[in-house]
Amino acid sequence: MNLTLDHTTLHRAAKYFMDSGKAASHEAAMNLLQQFGLTIYVGEEIRSSAAHQIALLTIVNVTRRTLLGGVEVIGLPDCDSLTALAPNTGLKEAVMALGGTPVAVARPEWPTALIGSVEDYSNKDTAWRVTWEGWRAGAAPLMIGDRLSEDNSMALAPALAAAVCAGEVFSHYAGDHPMAGRRTAGLSLWQPGADWLDVDESEPELAFLPSNLWIIGLGNLGQAFAWLLALMPYETPQELQLVLQDYDRIAPSNDSTSLLSYKHDTNKMKARVVADWLDKRGFTTFIEERRFGPWTKRHADEPGVALCGVDNALARSALDQAGFPLIVEAGLGGGPQAFRSLGIHTFPSSRTAAEIWAKQVALADTSTEDMPAYQALKKSGIDACGLTQLASRTVGVPFVGLIAACLAMSELLRRLHGGKAFEFIAGSTATLQDIEFGTLHAPPYAHGYTRAMPMGWPTAP
């Protein structure tokens, strides 16, 4: 189905090539994305390891939204899906439902990602290993050879590894980082800023999980939060009480950025789509379909921890006025130079939310209307209002949102396990080795928790 180009249908990764001048038209930008593809090889571990399945399903879900040439999987056996990401189905069916294609032969021109023990694979010159251990995860080029133990001790790690690999593949295709495909890239969620390849004996095995959360905003970040919650080893998913707050509807463009959005859900309320997805995985959800702002007040019986993923400075500046004892906010950059940027803030902190964001409320975004792609649209007859709306949309890719969501979610898990509390974390997926942060003293986590299944993983409800 061909959709009229407007701000609701614009592919947000295509916008990067339009805004940067790499593509002279929207059609040229889409043609570029349609040349991007990925071959994923899976090892024998995929049959019995939920961690490896999480890595596979995550990288398929993330990359198929930006690599429009296709995502193909080699070595996929007939076996059950072991996680709540794809309940009551086979793994092949789960991969296909997310947009991947099981194949027997690789396309030689596509780069390669390896998950598990794979010995025979194509395109060894442009290939990454998706790897993790404990709270650390990333992607390592095969030419370098680094590999971690790929254990089951921390549920977020394989998802983080998949997202990092997706980012490296995109940079390889975009040609905007000379080291993409020639460097390792990763993060420690226990010690942000530490070398992710170094063994860290202080990392605990995941033992506790939050039991009450309020998610504000259900776009790119909010849907990434939901995806990660489904990875968590809740013995009884119903123990997690979730308030889901968003007033917006799904647009076709959300398919390019948000992990639970599909074009067939266009015009459905985001909160209802996300709630339905979580309900099917056994969680308990409550919907709040109104804007967040200074008028929002939490009741004492409602979740005391808020995960915020809105991109609105006015809403952000009111975060600490709603009565939440703990808030973890995640934000993303938006322009062609900043779309890989991410930031995490927690409250209470040394600054109020208004001090951080009030000045951004009235700031105007830098215009890209003079770039060739927008001038081509102007010549094609698009009106001035439509052109301004298109130019004002942010560049967006799902792997940045998922990495930011991993950092936000790990803030809760770290505090639950007696680790450091961070006031802010800032960085870019292009330079994960240069994460900046500030720590603070925080009281013990007292906002509701449940025990994780020991060395376990979620199973389909």
From Swiss-Prot:
InterPro entries: Ubiquitin-activating_enz. Its EC number is 6.2.1.-. It comes from Collimonas sp. (strain OK412). GO terms for molecular function: ubiquitin-like modifier activating enzyme activity. The active site is at C385. GO terms for biological process: defense response to virus; protein modification by small protein conjugation. It is an enzyme of class 6 (ligase). The keyword Cell cycle does not apply. Component of the Bil (bacterial ISG15-like) antiviral defense system, composed of BilA, BilB, BilC and BilD. The Bil system specifically conjugates a ubiquitin-like moiety (bilA) to the bacteriophage central tail fiber (CTF, or tip attachment protein J) via reactions involving E1 (bilD) and E2 (bilB). Modifies CTF of phage SECphi27 and SECphi4, which probably interferes with assembly of the phage tail. Also modifies T5 baseplate hub protein pb3 (gene D16), but not gp27 of phage T6 (Bil defends against T6). BilD (E1) catalyzes the first step in conjugation. Keywords: Antiviral defense, Ligase, Thioester bond, Ubl conjugation pathway. This is Bacterial E1-like protein BilD.
